[in-house]
Amino acid sequence: MPNKFLIIDNSILPDIFEKVVKVKELLANGKVKDITEGVKTVGISRSTYYKYKDFVFSVSEGVKSQKATIGLLLGHERGTLSKILDRIAEYQGNILTINQDIPINNTANVSITFDISQMSIGLKELVEEIKNTKNVIKVDLIAME
């Protein structure tokens, strides 16, 4: 079953979820040296942190996302990546980074990060269009910020 993401106002959630996010922020900013120190700082158990850390995220810059990263597995065929980039640009997406592995067994992994703040269609619709592009084997939304 595919993951389904919801945006929920933290005021209706138990405090535990916000504390898990706080530990992740403290670790990322270097304000605590490890998970043990982080969970003590915010007042939750290590087991609670580990239970929810991969499932609770904060939304950066309010509700409207600015950047998205997609991961693709592409067949090694001339013009495939170009068609995908054209599709993103067609809907006013702005490419920020492209990382491409060398093709092995006629397939290549590619990740593309792009600005979605001015896009004329939703990200879900764009991903569906990319999935339907010739020689696209797989598309995954990796991150949104």
UniProtKB/Swiss-Prot annotation:
Coiled coil: none annotated. Residues 69-144 form the ACT domain. Pfam families: ACT_4. It comes from the Bacteria. Belongs to the UPF0735 family. This is UPF0735 ACT domain-containing protein CBO3010/CLC_2906. It comes from Clostridium botulinum (strain Hall / ATCC 3502 / NCTC 13319 / Type A).
